[in-house]
Amino acid sequence: MDCQEKLEVPVYTDVDKETFLRDIYPQRRPAVLKRVPIGPCVRTWTVCFLAEKGGDREVKVHVSPEPRMDFLHKNFVYRTLPFDEFIKRAAEAKHPEFFISEDESYYLRSLGEDARKEPADLRKQFPELAEDFHVPQFFEPEQFFSSVFRISSPGLQLWTHYDVMDNLLAQVTGKKRVVLYSPEDALHLYLTGDKSEVLDIDSPDLQLYPEFVKARRYECILEPGDLLFIPALWFHNTLALQFGVGVNVFWRHLPSESYDKKDPYGNKDPVAATRALQSLERTLGILDELPPDYRDFYARRMVLRIQSRAYIRKPINAAQENSDTT
C-alpha cells in the first residue's frame, strides 16, 4: 500500500540473551533475529516427517474457501482432521478430498489438551516434534506461558490483531510476510476488540477506512530459521508466502497477577485494562442521558483528560525543537 508510510523491521544476527535484553528488548519495537539456534526443526520438519511424527491424532483446524481469513463475516469453518491428513492438505494447492472447495485453505493454531483451561504447549501436544525445536532462552523459565504450533496453507492471510504478551514467532519452514503497526496507531486501525476491521491491508477501502492511511506500516519477510520479536500490543498481520510451519512462544512480561487466570489463549486484556474498559462503558451510558450537543462536548473533555492523564509523552529532541521554532 503506497499511501502508508512504510518502514522496515530492523534485523539482528547472532543474538544471545544478553544482547537481546540489552539492545533489543528495551526498545519495545519488533525485530527480526537471524542465526539464532532453534534446533534441527529447520532441516527435519518436512511434510513427510511432520505427517509421520504427528500421526493420526486429531486436530481442530480453520478451513476457508479463500485464503484471506475474515473474522467479521466468519468466512471459515472449524473442522477436525487427523494431523497427518491435515498436513498433506495444507501443503497442497488442490485437494482430492475437501470440505468446501478443492482449493480451500487450512490453518492450525494448536490448543491445550483442555482448550478451555490449558494453554498450548508444543512439548505436551506434540512431544515427538518438540524435541527438534529449541525455545530461545530470552526470558526466565517461570515467565513461559505457551508455545503455539501454527501451520498455514500457501497464501493464507490472518487478520490484523494484537496480543497482550510478548512473543517470539519462529518461522521454521516456508516464507512469511509480516506487517506490523505500532500501538500508537490504534486510533487509525478501526478496532473491534483486539482485531482491525481493515482486512485487506494492501488495497484497503479508503472510503470506508480513510484514517487507515495514517498508520505507519512496518514490514518484514521471515525466512526459515528466522525469529520475529513481537512486543505486546503491537498489531500484526501475517501472510504465508509458502506452505509454512511456525511456533509462537509467549511469555508473561508483566507480574502474573496482571493477567486473567482463566485465559488459556493468552489474548484477554490485562485485568486492570478490562476493569477500565468496563467502567468506560458505564460512563458512556451515563453520557447518553445528556442531549446530543452536551454529550459531544463532555465526551471531548473526557478524551482530553485521558490524553493528558494516560498518554505517554515523548521527549522532544533538540533538533526537533530547533525545527519547530524556525
From Swiss-Prot:
GO terms for molecular function: iron ion binding; protein homodimerization activity; tRNA binding; tRNA(Phe) (7-(3-amino-3-carboxypropyl)wyosine37-C2)-hydroxylase activity. Residues 106-268 form the JmjC domain. It catalyses: 7-[(3S)-3-amino-3-carboxypropyl]wyosine(37) in tRNA(Phe) + 2-oxoglutarate + O2 = 7-(2-hydroxy-3-amino-3-carboxypropyl)wyosine(37) in tRNA(Phe) + succinate + CO2. Its EC number is 1.14.11.42. PROSITE patterns: JMJC. One of its GO terms (biological process) is wybutosine biosynthetic process. It comes from the Eukaryota. It holds the Pfam family Cupin_8. Binds 1 Fe(2+) ion per subunit. Pathway: tRNA modification; wybutosine-tRNA(Phe) biosynthesis. Keywords: Dioxygenase, Iron, Metal-binding, Oxidoreductase, tRNA processing. InterPro entries: Cupin_8, JmjC_dom. 2-oxoglutarate binds at Y107, N167, K176. Fe cation binds at H161, D163, H236. Its cofactor is Fe(2+). tRNA hydroxylase that acts as a component of the wybutosine biosynthesis pathway. Wybutosine is a hyper modified guanosine with a tricyclic base found at the 3'-position adjacent to the anticodon of eukaryotic phenylalanine tRNA. Catalyzes the hydroxylation of 7-(a-amino-a-carboxypropyl)wyosine (yW-72) into undermodified hydroxywybutosine (OHyW*). OHyW* being further transformed into hydroxywybutosine (OHyW) by LCMT2/TYW4. OHyW is a derivative of wybutosine found in higher eukaryotes. PANTHER family: HYPOXIA-INDUCIBLE FACTOR 1 ALPHA INHIBITOR-RELATED (PTHR12461), TRNA WYBUTOSINE-SYNTHESIZING PROTEIN 5 (PTHR12461:SF104). This is tRNA wybutosine-synthesizing protein 5. It comes from Danio rerio (Zebrafish).
